[in-house]
Amino acid sequence: MRDIELLAPSLDQLEALAREAFARLPQEFRDLTGDMVFFVQDFPEDDVINDLELDSPYDILGLFSGPDLAERSGAFQVSSPTMIFLYRRPILDYWAEEGESLEHIVRHVLVHEIGHHFGLSDEQMEAIEESD
């Protein structure tokens, strides 16, 4: 049994942690997203669970939503916001089970949600995660 007491952060505290983690990511990576809007919820909405055909709301830690590079740079630029959703309860469960730092988990979720959306390879995302 661990000697560490895990104190669950509030929604606001987790959002602050995500903003700090995002600010420490490489500038070139952050530039992919444009202005990022952060949403932290305890669980994903039912439509997200249904659209992604998830078995459980604990099956997803985060979700990126926004235009891709082609939509943002074409002749008819899409002006929809770039958003990242972080799901607090699944993140906290993962944190308690895996024993990784919460900061590391949040950074990992950010890098992978943004990276997958923009077509980065696993190797590229791993390099971004290691740059700090």
Feature locations, PLM:
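Active-site rim/adjacent substrate-binding subdomains
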Residues: 1-105, 117, 121-126, 132
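Catalytic glutamate of the conserved HExxH
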Residues: 109, 113-117
